[in-house]
Amino acid sequence: MTGADNAISVRGLTKKYGDHVVLNGVDLDVARGSVFALLGSNGAGKTTLVKILATVLSADAGTATVNGHDLGQQARSVRQAISLTGQFAAVDEILTGRENLVLIARLRHQADPGEVADRLLAQFGLTDAGARRVGTYSGGMRRRLDIAMSLIGDPPIVFLDEPTTGLDPQARIDVWNAVRGLADSGTTVLLTTQYLDEAEHLADRIAILHEGRIIVDGTLADLKRLLPPVEVEYIEKQPTLEDVFLAVVSDDDLGRSA
């Protein structure tokens, strides 16, 4: 894959806080129009990496390009090409869902804020709830509205940092459907998660970040090939992503302690 095929390319990215190394030479490539899942435990450095790529934080070393723009030299162009949503929906609970969208569309100087709002409400299955105050929405509805708001202005790249944290199973599925819809429309999605099933359901490619380093990176099939199938009562059982995650993290820890 050439650099032109990548929406995001990262080489040797490093971040420290005092003596604590959060990111230790991260390399990764995210293909355009794909869903890339960055999988890791709490404290692995996932959110720090996303904040650096979104220009919220600066790296101590390394290089990155986002939508063809150099992160260090063209931060403004990077910001114009991305949208970032965090673990908690940044919506105004007093306003209706439609009013939230119209407000952001006006702030982003859209020609027809009302049309933008109605289109996004339909895209995320919120048309019937558009006239209701967001304070009455379920967690999944708020998160979908938050993602919809992040798409105003049609950014080609969306960062979703732990988008289903704290949601019930049905709400998580609703958000998953919204994320797949983004990729189907050509948007590049970089998703951070600690939920293995989320990465398994959504991602075209998965990287495992452990103690500040990418220790494996590939498709789900690639990762499963890292472990051999086992026989359970004469039935061959393929490894799950959970099996792979636990094995590679354990191997990495053993290698570092040896």
Stretches found by the model and what they are:
Residues G62-Q73, S77-V78:
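Conserved ABC transporter NBD signature motif
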Residues S83, V102, R106-A129:
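Conserved ABC ATPase "signature" region
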Residues V158-E162:
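Catalytic Walker B motif of ABC-type/P-loop ATPase nucleotide-binding domains
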Residues D217-G218:
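ABC ATPase "signature
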